[in-house]
Structures are given as structure tokens and as C-alpha cells.
Amino acid sequence: MATSNERKPAIFLLSLGCSKNTVDSERLTAQAVASGLTFTDDVDEASIILINTCGFIEDAKKESIDEMLAAIGKKEEGIVREVYVMGCLVELYRKELSEEMPEVDGWFGTRQLPDVLAAIGAHYCEELYDRRELLTPPHYAFLKISEGCNRRCSFCSIPKIRGPYVSQPIEQLLREAALLQEQGVRELNLIAQDISVYGYDLYGKPALNDLTLRLSDMGFDWIRLLYAYPLNFPLEVIDTMRQRRNVCNYLDMPLQHINDRILKSMQRGIGRKGTEELIDAIRQKNPDIRLRTTMIAGYPSETREEFDELLDFVRQARFDRLGCFPYRHEEHAPAYALEDTISDKEKEERVGELMELQESIAASLNRKLEGQTLTVLIDRIEDNVAYGRTEYDAPEVDNDVIIEIGDEAVEEGEFRQVTVEDSTAYELFGRVGSECS
């Protein structure tokens, strides 16, 4: 039975993909709320479904398409009135999608915020651009410091999707950060497709360290740096981590591979020697830093010997956090011109082999934390168990600290001292102590 849409003028927003997409969705939500619109977490209580898609890899594309089809189904059942789709997948396939899914009421790319708002009955206001309605827990947020990318990594379609690199001015980012602080944000995670070159286009020099210092002065409890590119990385940021208590001793720097031939084909602009020298310099400047990286296994023509070289490198480098993904042959990426020579089965086996190695490294590193007392930010509480993170763990991807809280008064979003009693490769188990001031 069709439901009366007039009685529920709410929007169901589904934000897929990365944290950069999350920020886009938060900006949109803030503008829509300022125009008097409401949002609901229950799709059956909505009159409009709005999907912010991801188009980075095949699995993400499939998820986005599946969600579109589900939304169309809700429209055909009379549960919702309109369906709109925005984001990265639309940038790549707008024509094909609109032909295949005429039931969708509007398609919008990554740079069409005013148009999306107009379609759902809201008004775009430039003065509200810095405002966001958080989709994360209220104690942490992502600060997107730039748009787009000027790198030309062969496996990546982001420059085609997001356009050229554009830094956001420092003063604008400080205003946005101040608004987030007013909302109760304690942990600020700096993100971009490439944070390493932040500021070059605006100031003619690297400005990541200047931005980090200014944000540190604002008094956030934690400031975290994510998605650094190894080429042209500004090492002075590592000095700032060591000197400023509220700048986390943590860096996410995807390396993708270590073999020189593969790195050259990937168009990374840096080889093994430069990569190893950079890692050594970072660790010498800040021995307490935790490094997270990402690798790709099964890149076109990667030989067994080249993959073994990657394994040996990871074994020696002992990264604190590491993710590995099988190479995906994406039609909008430059490497699509190469022959995808390695079977999916072999790719998955290589990923498994590398992650098994990393699991043993992570387990060994975590065992060394047993008996130590660490500062932990409590993310959530479920069934009398608290889940949190140390400064060495980014939201959603790194270690959980799991705490049986018993009769302790523990709240989400607070910092507590936790003594680690046990561990696995990706979890720490502890007991809670005092609240941090």
C-alpha cells in the first residue's frame, strides 16, 4: 500500500565511499537543514532518497548501483516520491546511468552542490559553506583540506572524477575547524587525496605544517594526518608531531609498492631508494611515530619475484598499520591500457599472503603494549563494553581498544586512561582508569 508522502517530507541520505565523500554529504546536509528540510535514518519514513556514490573501484561501483536499484524499488512501491543520485560514480557514468535508470529524478556530479540542493527543495548559501551536520560520532570529524589531485598514478581515476588539485585557504579551514569545535569535536582528522602538496597552488610553497600549527593552537585534543603522498612530503610536519602534544604521532602514507619497475609503471614519481630514505628520515625525526600504509598486489605484469620483494620490504619495515588491496582494472585509470595479466585468484592469494605477514607484525607490536597505560578516546559503548582508540589509531580502519567497563561511569567522546591487559593483531583489551583532564 502506498504511503502518503505529504505527511513525511524527510530526506534519507545514503553516503557511500570515503571520508571525503562524508564531508561532502555533511556540507549538503547543513545547507538543507538551514533551508528547513529534515532528514531521517529510516528510509521508509522518507519522501526523498539521496545517494552520494563512490566510483573508485569495481566493488564500490557495484554497491552504489545496488543501492540505486533498491531506491528505485522504494519509489515504484510508492514509499518515496523522488530519488536523486550524486557523487563520483555520476562523474564517470552520467550518460550511461541516466539511460539505464530513467526512474532516477536527477543526476549530479561532485561539483554540483547548489544544483543538488535546488532539486531537493533547498537553497545554497555561500556563507554556510563551512557548516556541516556531522555524520560521524560528534567527538571526531574530518577536515578536507583540498579537492582533486594532480598526481597521475596509473591505477587511479580520482583526477578524472575530482579534477585538479585545489587547496582550501588556511583561514577558511580555521573557520570550519572552529565551527566543528563548537559542535564538540575533539579529534580533527585532516584529509585530502594528497595532503603532502597542500598549499603549493595558493602560497607557492608547502603549507601543511603551517596549517597543522594553526589548528594545534586552537586546542583540539587530537589532530591526525591522513593520506600523505611520499613524493614531496614536508618533513617539518614530523617535527611538529614530536613537539606538539595534540598532533598525533601517526601518519597515513600509502606507498602502493616498493619494486622500482612497478613504481615506475604506477607513475608514482619515487622509487625504492627514495621511499626507504623517507621512512628512515621520518622515524629518525620522531621515533614514537606510527606509520600506516597501503599496498597493491597483482598489478599488471607483477612477477612473483617482484611480489616477494614487496613481502621482504614489509617484513623489514614493520609498518604499524597496513592495508593491501588486489589491483582492479579500472577503465578510467591509465593502467587500463595495460594487459591485466594476473588472475583474480592469484591477486587474492597475494593479498592474503601479505596480510598474513602484516598480521604477525601487528600482533608482535601490540604484545609490546601489554602492561602499558594509554590514553584512549571512547568512540562507542555497547552492552557494557567500551570501544576506543589510541592516538596511534585512525577512525574506522585501525585498532580497537576494548574495555569491559563494569560499574565504571564511561561516556562516549571522553578520554580515559586504559591499562592494556591483552591483545590480538588488531585489538587491545584493557581496564579503564582515570578520566583524562
UniProtKB/Swiss-Prot annotation:
Domain MTTase N-terminal, residue spans: 9-125
GO molecular function, one term: protein methylthiotransferase activity
Annotated [4Fe-4S] cluster 2 binding sites: 149, 153, 156
Entry binding sites for [4Fe-4S] cluster 1: 18, 54, 88
Compartments reported by the entry: Cytoplasm
Disulfide bonds: none
Keywords: 4Fe-4S, Cytoplasm, Iron, Iron-sulfur, Metal-binding, S-adenosyl-L-methionine, Transferase
Cofactor: [4Fe-4S] cluster
Alphabetical list of InterPro entries matching this protein: Elp3/MiaA/NifB-like_rSAM, Methylthiotransferase, Methylthiotransferase_CS, Methylthiotransferase_N, Methylthiotransferase_N_sf, NA-bd_OB-fold, Ribosomal_uS12_MeSTrfase_RimO, rSAM
Gene: rimO
GO-annotated cellular components: cytosol
Listed SMART domains: Elp3
Function: Catalyzes the methylthiolation of an aspartic acid residue of ribosomal protein uS12.
NCBIfam families to which the protein is assigned, alphabetical: 30S ribosomal protein S12 methylthiotransferase RimO, MiaB/RimO family radical SAM methylthiotransferase
Reaction catalysed by this enzyme: L-aspartate(89)-[ribosomal protein uS12]-hydrogen + (sulfur carrier)-SH + AH2 + 2 S-adenosyl-L-methionine = 3-methylsulfanyl-L-aspartate(89)-[ribosomal protein uS12]-hydrogen + (sulfur carrier)-H + 5'-deoxyadenosine + L-methionine + A + S-adenosyl-L-homocysteine + 2 H(+)
Source superkingdom: Bacteria
EC number(s) stated in the UniProt entry for this protein: 2.8.4.4
Family named by the database record: Belongs to the methylthiotransferase family. RimO subfamily.
Enzyme class: transferase
Protein name per its UniProtKB record: Ribosomal protein uS12 methylthiotransferase RimO
CDD domains xrefs: Radical_SAM
Domain TRAM: from-to ranges: 367-434
UniProt keyword annotation of Iron-sulfur present: yes
Keyword Iron-sulfur in record: yes
Principal localisation: cytoplasm
Cofactor note: Binds 2 [4Fe-4S] clusters. One cluster is coordinated with 3 cysteines and an exchangeable S-adenosyl-L-methionine.
